[in-house]
């Protein structure tokens, strides 16, 4: 093997990822009712440009074309999410039209020879549930159980890979704590309560999967980052440990160890009110690592201590160059360090799947082509980190590039492009970027 050859295991899973609200559009078609993101987008100043997902990539009408394009680009696996408000538009109502959309999508996926990974929850909570208190209320867990059961009953034998929850950190902390995401609340007590209930839904889905005797694999996806201290000063080291507890350990430790990290419980103090939202049996329900751990990784953080009144009393040091269009540092060495740490501290041999990794770049369409060399470079360097981890015995079994299409990038609207396929939002024309063509060649050779 030459020094520049990175060949992956024969069974390695190559895929691409999307999510329902970011690509589907058709928000008032097919019996769908509003999600919390439809409502959030109407709040002035919450989303850049006042953008929303009403049309997005219009995947609702273009799904056949999109799946065919995946096939042409050589993908073997496709990770997508189901829009909960398409399935449960109101309390006690199951919408057959919504189920049919995903049935037809799965027909296309199977015709194209792709293997599906279905995400049950990627942030589009039905607004009617939020009106009842959303993720701060335990009743939402029962609504989720009904929804997950319907999906499993309808599609159970067609799904090879189940992703219970995508990024519980973002859904809870950004949604109920910082207010950056829907529903836009700024209440730390609500945020930690929401996080607990969302983690419980992972356990609920895992139990349903067992009870129904489904043969597909099931697991959760966490967004995790490698955290470095800005200096060796004790206060900066302690600040970095807090940041790690906030974004990584608060979600990984319940899944793998059945408890919340004690140092963070102590630090959060009154915001948790003695963890009074934790009832007997909750932690046992959550502590179900499943068949795999999904990881979404984009960048590292460099943290120093502050003396302000914020929750963590930390701040992010300015990212070092090079950075993506999000301003996120490109640091593949941290990806390798994170994977090594995850296996050592948490997964301990459980298969790991990279369910998202990619970069927003300022792409330019010139003569019908997009030479996104920055994105290509980002992906290639991060795949080298994956390869190194595997070579050292790491149980990494697959990589899903984010994202298949340019799409609605949450609070950033349409101002950031993560896709390996360019979208002209006026015409809905799809144009594979240079990174997609490189990825096709790479998958065909199972390496580079």
Curated annotation (Swiss-Prot):
It is an enzyme of class 3 (hydrolase). It holds the Pfam family Glyco_hydro_1. The active site is at 167 (proton donor), 356 (nucleophile). It comes from Paenibacillus polymyxa. Keywords: Carbohydrate metabolism, Cellulose degradation, Glycosidase, Hydrolase, Polysaccharide degradation. Its EC number is 3.2.1.21. The gene is bglB. It catalyses: Hydrolysis of terminal, non-reducing beta-D-glucosyl residues with release of beta-D-glucose. The keyword Hydrolase applies. The keyword Hydrolase applies. GO terms for molecular function: beta-glucosidase activity. InterPro entries: Glyco_hydro_1, Glyco_hydro_1_AS, Glyco_hydro_1_beta-glucosidase, Glyco_hydro_1_N_CS, Glycoside_hydrolase_SF. Belongs to the glycosyl hydrolase 1 family. This is Beta-glucosidase B. One of its GO terms (biological process) is cellulose catabolic process. NCBIfam families: BGL.
